[in-house]
C-alpha cells in the first residue's frame, strides 16, 4: 500500500497568543487519535502554529485502511431455532443486523457449544474519504473556552477562518471545513512576501511558506530564533536578557517573522524600583528587560518586530516613545507614594471590602497581625517584627503604584517599608507574604516572612470555609487550593513546629462570631490534608502510601512528611509485603470481633510457643519504640518493626485465634490489637498494596 504526506492548514485571523501552543498540540493529539482509531498507518504527526494559522503535516500516511475480516457471533443454536427448526426472533434480529438471512449464517462449534456465526471480508475505506470528517472532528474537540461566530453563518471557531488547505500528496481533498471550501491556497505575511500563493504538494510545507510567504510556521523554530537573537543582542550591550519562558512563548505566538531589535530608555528611570519598570516592559509591552552582570537593570530593552524594515531605527524609536510615558507614570507614582509613610494607608483599608461577610481589608489586617504574632511565637520568630509586618501587610494595596501596576503588590510594600526605615525582615516579609505563588515558587526566606505568609493564607482559608464557600469543581475564586498548598510547603520545607489543628483554631477564633460553619476547623484541615494527597502524588509517592498515612490523620505537616518518608522506605524492606498483609489480616479479624478486649495481654494465659514469642517481642518493641515515636523517628521505628515478620508469620501458621476458649481467644485478640497499635503509631500499613 502506497503512502503519502498529508497537510492540513487552517488559515485564520490572529489567534489568542497564550492559547496558540495548546491549540496546536491538541489539534495534533486529536488528529493522531482519529488516525489510530481509523486504523490508518502513519508516520510522524508534526504540528505548526503561527498567529494566523494552525497546521498539521503527517508523514507516510496510508492511502486506505487495511482490509479486515470480521466475525460476529450470534445466538447459541439452542436459542436460534425452535422445536420445529424455525429461526427464533433473536436469530432473525441478529441476522438482520448483519445484513444476511439466518440460512446464510455459518456455524461456530467449540467445546462449550455451537453458535450462529457471521463472517465477512471488509474492504478498507480510502483515506481521502475519511480525512474531511477526521479533520472536522479534531477541530471540534479543541480546548476553546469561548467560540466566535462571524458573518451570517452559524460556524463557530476560536477566530474567523479564511483558508482551509487539505493536501494528500499533490491532490486537494475536497471538503468544507468551518464553512470554507478546501483548496491549495495559502496566505503569507500581511506585509512581506506573497500575500497569497498555491502549494503543489504537501511535502513543500513549511519551506514554501517561509520562502514565498515570509512566515516561519514552526513554532519552536520561531521561539528558538527569538531566544538566540535576544541573547546575542543583550551580549552586544554587555548584559543578559530576561527571557522568561512564559514571555518567550507569548512573543513567539505574536509574530510570524521575528526580528529582534534593541532599544533604550532614560537612565533617570532606574531610580524607580526595577520590579515596576520590568512589570511595564514585560506585562504591558512584551519587551525583554536587560540586566548587567551584577544583576542590576540596564536602561535598555529588547523587543521583537514582526517585519524586516528598511529603517529599523524608526521601529526602535517608535517603541521607545511608547514605553517612555509608562515609565514616567511609574516614576511619578513612586515619588508620590513616598511622600507619606506606608502606615498612613491603614485608614483607607477600611474602605475596601475583603469579602462581604468577612469585613474589610482593615479587618483582615487586624486578624493577620494577631495570627502572625501567634505563629511567630510558635516557631521562634521575632513576635514584634511579625506583628508589625502583619499591620503593614496590605498597606501597599492603597498606593498609586500598586493601583496602576497590580502585580507589584508586596514588592512595593517592601520598597516603601525600607524607605520608612522599617526592620529589614519586616520589609522582606511584605514582599514574600504571597509566596509561594505557584508550584515550584520560592518560599519566604526568613522566619518573620514565613509567619506572615502562613497567617495571610490561613486567614483566607478559615474565613472562606467559615462561610461555606469552599472550592467546588474547578471553581476556586479565592485560590484556596494554592493557599493550602503554600501553607503546607512552608511548614514542611522549613520544618516549622506548627500543628494544623491549633493553627486553624486560632485563625477561626480571630473571626469572632462572623463565621457560620460550625465544622470549619475540621473542614479546613480535611481540605489541607487533601492537598497533601495531590502534592505527594506529584512528588512520585504511590497512592496507597499516601492513604496509609492519611488514615492516621496527622495534623502536624512536618510530622506528616516524616511518616510519608518512613512508609516509603519501609516499602523497600523485604518484610514489607508480608507485614502489610499480616496487618490487613489482623485488621479484618479485629473488625469481625465485637468482644471487649483487655488493656493488656495476660502472659499466664499464653500457651503456644509462637504466641509467647510474639507477645514478648511486642512488649519489648513497645517500650523500645516509645522514644522513637516521641521524637518522630518513624523510619527507624518501622525498620525495628520489620523484625516482627518471622514471629508474626509463625504465629499465623501455628496458632488459631478464634478458638472456643473465651479467655484464650480474648487474650490472643488483645495481643493482635497491641501488635497493630504499634504499626498504627506510624501509619495504617494494612492499606499498602
Swiss-Prot record:
Stored SUPFAM superfamilies: HD-domain/PDEase-like
Keyword Oxidoreductase among UniProt keywords: no
Catalytic activity: tRNA(Gly) + glycine + ATP = glycyl-tRNA(Gly) + AMP + diphosphate
Keyword ATP-binding: yes
Entry EC number(s): 6.1.1.14
Alphabetical keyword list: Aminoacyl-tRNA synthetase, ATP-binding, Cytoplasm, Ligase, Nucleotide-binding, Protein biosynthesis
Location, primary (coarse class): cytoplasm
Gene Ontology CC: one annotated term: cytosol
Class of this enzyme: ligase
Disulfide linkage: none
Localisation per UniProt entry: Cytoplasm
One MF annotation (Gene Ontology) recorded for this entry: ATP binding
A single BP term in Gene Ontology: arginyl-tRNA aminoacylation
InterPro entries documented for this protein: DALR_anticod-bd, Gly-tRNA-synth_bsu, Gly-tRNA-synth_heterodimer
Assembly, per entry: Tetramer of two alpha and two beta subunits.
Family recorded in the similarity comment: Belongs to the class-II aminoacyl-tRNA synthetase family.
Protein name, per record: Glycine--tRNA ligase beta subunit
Organism of provenance: Escherichia coli O139:H28 (strain E24377A / ETEC)
Lineage summary: Bacteria, Pseudomonadati, Pseudomonadota, Gammaproteobacteria, Enterobacterales
